[in-house]
Amino acid sequence: MKLKMYHDSNCPYSRKVLIMASEHQLGDIFDFVSPFSKAGQETLVEDNPLAKMPALVVSPGFAIFDSRVICRYVDSLRKNTPSFYPAEGEALWRALRYESLGDGMLDSAIAARQELTRPKEHQMPERLEKQLAKVYAGLKCLERELDRLEGPLT
């Protein structure tokens, strides 16, 4: 049975879920629904009151949303591939911390891009600088902790 996933191909969080599924050889488990299609618009808010991408309907009347939660769910479906998440302890908390750091950097990069798409007269350089500073701080954090990361970096 395929799982209904509300998915926008321009959404980096949707792509994050697709990468997780692909790494676990589960890329064919989704039945994609565009939030912009008539069918998607009619059911999205019923399944996900926040109407954010991605959202995954795992059983009738029960959807999970937020890419972090969906990635954990997809990771739990794996069969012949190792988990992306350590089982417990500090290693798990580090992995979740890196995931949060990556999502936060992505949030800031998106906010910076949105600022640049505003009409020039409405742009706020301070906001752009603040968002980019968060991205750079996240990169510096990863650089400092590079020796703690295990496995191949892709």
Feature map (PLM): residue ranges:
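GST-like domain detector, emphasizing the conserved glutathione-binding G-site
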Residues: 1-127
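Amphipathic alpha-helical packing segments from all-alpha helical-bundle domains
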Residues: 127-146
